[in-house]
């Protein structure tokens, strides 16, 4: 109930002070959440400590603005009625989360709903309204408790009853959905976790050893008869389409294990200067039969925004690349079944996964390299978002990570077999295929749009009444 003190504070403060308290609250929250960024910059950049805190402070301060905006809006609406302000606060919060996930390219990391990723009965409502539905329930519960401290007994009771009905309805729906029979169709998939330290991934002298690790893991997986074997993001040390010998080796490997291979590689196209893309290739004994180029690139990781003005930052860190985004959310037709790939943090964008599901994907594969995060909370925070993609569309998610956390996630959002960080291993499991369409698959972020509409109308009505 971490939002209760914030709501109690801001309903009795002027708007400007409330915004300040909200911004401070949000900034501290994101500083704690994003502290793995300090590790990344300390380890892989030339920025001296303690200046490595700079990027983390900047991002946390930016994300904190959205909490400040919600706090300021609640304060303003509380002028004529604290009860109504608290009633609207869940919608204000959801609207702010949606805007943060879209403005300036979007950064939907750490949405409040993700905190419940292990609470399966709670997160089942994501199939109705996405992760935003879970955020709404959490904020509603906090607002009701805050009302107990600042409202009259009758008004507070009304708020508690409404929030209680919402929470009980959420849990009842969750219990009902968790008792539903599982989909019948399934395929057998193996995921590789090679646990190759980031500094070694693209060192020329280590290339042969890297390939050898993958070959050994894949041959070992072949004994369990998978139909698809998944390697992580940028697994290959050389661009696949520029290395015919490596391509032939993978074709032979696919034939030997009798399974399709899904491998991550940098793709190089053109000359002087070539275009580089972060790609996933599907191979069989017949060669490359499909390719997906990453669409959502990581700012200051895979490209530099406003590079004409601040392109100099590339010299600060070895992890800053200049990649070209893909242009199409493509779905692999198989083998073994229609599936789609999201690379690295693409899967934290609900609308992209929805587009892939609408395109016919019956399975979602996430290929990632979270070695940049080291042994911090970063890889676990990244993992926590994928149960929601599973529930939103009732689709299984298969996750192959270079250093972890690799996992099989069921359509219920349950995280099944998974690895530890920096563990070299192979996991093989039968994976169910998506069989139907959810409300979220069909209508997308309708709840977020409703939240934005009601929030905007509430603020406009307050402004009109104040001016009248």
Where do the language-model regions lie?
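Membrane-embedded alpha-helical bundles of multi-pass enzymes
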Residues: 1-177, 374-375, 386-390, 401-409, ...
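Soluble catalytic domains of enzymes that build or remodel membrane lipids, polysaccharides, and related
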Residues: 177-447
């Amino acid at each position: 109930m971490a939002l209760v003190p914030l709501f109690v504070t801001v309903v009795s403060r002027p708007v400007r002070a409330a915004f300040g308290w909200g911004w401070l609250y949000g900034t501290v929250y994101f500083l704690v959440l994003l502290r793995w960024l300090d590790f990344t910059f300390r380890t892989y950049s030339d920025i001296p400590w303690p200046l490595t805190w700079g990027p983390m402070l900047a991002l946390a301060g930016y994300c904190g603005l959205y909490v400040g905006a919600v706090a300021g809006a609640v304060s303003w609406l509380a002028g004529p009625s604290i009860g109504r302000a608290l009633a609207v606060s869940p919608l204000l919060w959801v609207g702010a989360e949606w805007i943060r996930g879209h403005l300036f390219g979007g950064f939907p990391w750490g949405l409040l709903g993700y905190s419940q990723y292990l609470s399966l009965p709670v997160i089942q409502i994501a199939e109705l309204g996405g992760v935003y539905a879970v955020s709404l329930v959490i904020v509603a519960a906090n607002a009701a408790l805050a009302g107990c401290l600042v409202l009259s007994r009758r008004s507070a009771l009304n708020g508690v009853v409404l929030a209680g009905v919402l929470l009980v309805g959420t849990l009842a729906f969750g219990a009902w959905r968790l008792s539903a029979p599982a989909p019948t169709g399934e395929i057998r998939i193996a995921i590789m976790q090679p646990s190759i330290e980031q500094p070694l991934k693209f060192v020329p002298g280590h290339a042969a050893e890297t390939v050898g690790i993958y070959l050994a893991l894949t041959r070992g997986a072949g004994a369990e008869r998978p139909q698809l074997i998944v390697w992580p993001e940028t697994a290959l040390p050389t661009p696949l389409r520029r290395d015919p010998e490596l391509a032939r080796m993978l074709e032979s490997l696919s034939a030997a294990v009798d399974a399709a291979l899904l491998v991550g590689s940098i793709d190089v196209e053109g000359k002087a200067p070539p275009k580089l893309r972060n790609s996933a290739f599907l191979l069989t004994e017949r060669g490359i039969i499909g390719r997906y180029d990453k669409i959502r690139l990581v700012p200051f990781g895979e490209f530099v925004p406003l590079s004409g003005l601040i392109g100099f930052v590339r010299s600060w860190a070895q992890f800053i690349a200049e990649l070209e985004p893909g242009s199409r959310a493509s779905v692999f037709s198989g083998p073994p079944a229609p599936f789609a790939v999201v690379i690295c943090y693409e899967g934290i964008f609900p609308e992209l996964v929805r587009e892939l599901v609408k395109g016919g994907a019956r399975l979602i594969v996430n290929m990632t390299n979270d070695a940049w995060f080291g042994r911090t909370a970063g890889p676990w925070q990244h993992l926590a978002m994928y149960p929601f993609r599973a529930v939103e569309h009732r689709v299984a998610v298969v996750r192959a990570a270079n250093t972890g956390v690799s996992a099989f996630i069921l359509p219920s959002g349950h995280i099944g077999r998974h690895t530890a960080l920096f563990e070299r291993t192979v996991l093989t499991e039968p994976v169910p295929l998506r069989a139907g369409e959810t409300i979220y698959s069909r209508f997308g972020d309708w709840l977020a749009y409703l939240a934005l509409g009601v929030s905007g109308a509430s603020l406009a009505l307050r402004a009109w009444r104040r001016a009248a």
